[in-house]
């Protein structure tokens, strides 16, 4: 057997060994709290539903009617909704945003990401929601609202695990955070009512004002608090102490606030949820399809956009091709793995905290829209963990441009 054949035959075994190691590394990259998140969400829902069914007096404890409220949401629930959004915002490097825009590749990737996140993403989720929930208007609206809410912070975790470009990811997260203040209201009305031809109980102008106010309160308040906490803490304590002590204290409150919010919702709605569990579970279909389609569509697009259009350069001639015989993508070897991963996970992720907060504010904590919005994080964490593992598995099978 020739040396080339020996080298070629050794590639699969090496790749398989790398894959097994990468899978374990990917899983270990998450904290045990992150890994337990799907189970703790399910446990919170089960306990709340049991309380709702067997303690009927609990169902109206958190209703806005007859209690102090903000934007139609009871104060106890409002506190939970705001608390769960502050920690992700505190993790974003707001103080460094001006440095990144000087890099030409970031400006180019930002334009592509805006198109994927604000045009393709909501369209894809709307199409999938209609496909699976054609006869379930309220659940469909809740799923569409998840699609309109683009991810602002959780993607930082997935990007780091998959080996994405951290600088690019920070720019995309900050840009999406600011754009959501402006775009969420018109897009929610457009996809939930205008193109869906769903009946409006009020005028377009009044509905727009309600959605815009809800976004201003339930994104604006935590956004402002999060930025003040980060910038103030960095000034007083320094970056090292902030990340070592302050951020470590703040981070768990995102999931504490989220689980508390889930608990309240299912106490209010749990008894009805049991009777409609079949139609509610249908919400899983568009969400699961969205995560996988969005991720692999972006992966394929990033490879396609890197294909050389020159007649004289049809295939890769870099050193990697000489070393790896059995690889794919020789014509698209200009693709960067780190940039591709950042685009894939930014496209596949959603801001489930915002969609849940707005659903509660607009339709009430006992609405089907709010129930549908709770399924986002239940599915997003395990599926994106799977996709992070898939990214590690796919990497050795493709040639990548590592110059960045």
UniProtKB/Swiss-Prot annotation:
Positions bearing carbohydrate: 201, 365
GO molecular function, one term: antimonite transmembrane transporter activity
Gene Ontology, cellular component aspect: plasma membrane
Transmembrane segments: 35-55, 70-90, 114-134, 142-162, 170-190, 217-237, 246-266, 281-301, 344-364, 370-390
Documented effect of changing residue 176 to A: Leads to ER retention, protein unstability and arsenite sensitivity
Observed phenotype of the null mutant: Leads to sensitivity to antimony, tellurite, cadmium, and phenylarsine oxide.
Effect of residue 230 to A: Leads to ER retention, protein unstability and arsenite sensitivity
Effect of residue 353 to A: Impairs arsenite resistance
Keyword Flavoprotein carried by entry: no
UniProt biotechnology annotation: Heterologous expression endows plants with greater arsenic resistance by enhancing arsenite efflux. Reduces arsenic accumulation in rice grains. Does not lower significantly arsenic tissue levels in Arabidopsis.
Gene Ontology biological process terms from the UniProt entry: antimonite transmembrane transport; arsenite transport; monoatomic ion transport; response to arsenic-containing substance
Extracellular topological intervals: 56-69, 135-141, 191-216, 267-280, 365-369
Effect of residue 380 to A: Impairs arsenite resistance
Cytoplasmic membrane side: 1-34, 91-113, 163-169, 238-245, 302-343, 391-404
Effect on the protein upon substituting residue 283 to A: Does not alter the arsenite/proton exchange across the plasma membrane
Principal location class: membrane
Subcellular location: Cell membrane
Entry function: Plasma membrane transporter that confers resistance to toxic metalloids by mediating extrusion of arsenite (As(III)) and antimonite (Sb(III)) out of cells. Displays low-affinity As(III)/H(+) and Sb(III)/H(+) exchange activity.
Family affiliation: Belongs to the arsenical resistance-3 (ACR3) (TC 2.A.59) family.
Protein name: Arsenical-resistance protein 3
């Amino acid at each position: 057997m020739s040396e080339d054949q020996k080298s070629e035959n050794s590639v699969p075994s090496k790749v398989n060994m790398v894959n097994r190691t990468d899978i374990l590394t990917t899983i270990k990259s998450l904290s045990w709290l992150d890994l337990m998140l799907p189970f703790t969400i399910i446990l919170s829902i089960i306990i709340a539903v049991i309380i709702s069914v067997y303690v009927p007096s609990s169902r109206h404890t958190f209703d806005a009617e007859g209690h102090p409220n903000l934007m139609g949401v009871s104060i106890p629930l409002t506190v939970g909704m705001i608390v769960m959004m502050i920690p992700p915002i505190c993790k974003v490097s707001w103080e460094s945003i001006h440095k990144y825009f000087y890099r030409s590749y970031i400006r180019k990737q930002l334009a592509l990401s805006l198109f994927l996140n604000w045009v393709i993403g909501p369209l894809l989720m709307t199409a999938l929601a209609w496909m699976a929930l054609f006869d379930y208007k309220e659940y469909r609206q809740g799923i569409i609202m998840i699609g309109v809410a683009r991810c602002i912070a959780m993607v930082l975790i997935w990007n780091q695990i998959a080996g994405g470009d951290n600088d690019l990811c920070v720019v995309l997260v900050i840009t999406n955070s600011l754009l959501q203040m402006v775009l969420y209201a018109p897009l929610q009305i457009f996809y939930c009512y205008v193109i869906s031809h769903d009946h409006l109980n009020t005028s377009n102008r009044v509905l727009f004002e309600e959605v815009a106010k809800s976004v201003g309160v339930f994104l604006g308040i935590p956004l402002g608090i999060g930025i003040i906490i980060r910038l103030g803490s960095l000034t007083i304590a320094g970056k090292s102490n902030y990340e070592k002590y302050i951020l470590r204290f703040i981070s768990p409150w995102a999931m504490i606030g989220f689980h508390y919010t889930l608990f309240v919702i299912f106490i209010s709605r749990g008894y009805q949820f049991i009777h409609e569990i079949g139609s509610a579970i249908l919400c899983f279909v568009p969400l699961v399809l969205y995560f996988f389609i969005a991720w692999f569509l972006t992966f394929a697009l990033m490879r396609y956009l890197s294909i050389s259009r020159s007649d004289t350069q049809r295939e890769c001639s870099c050193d990697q091709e000489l070393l790896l015989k059995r690889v794919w993508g020789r014509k698209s070897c200009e693709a960067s793995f780190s940039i591709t991963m950042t685009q894939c996970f930014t496209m596949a992720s959603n801001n489930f905290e915002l969609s849940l907060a707005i659903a509660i504010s607009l339709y009430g904590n006992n609405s089907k829209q709010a129930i549908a919005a709770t399924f986002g994080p239940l599915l997003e964490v395990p599926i994106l963990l799977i996709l992070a593992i898939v990214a590690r598995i796919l990497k050795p099978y493709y040639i990548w441009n590592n110059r960045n």
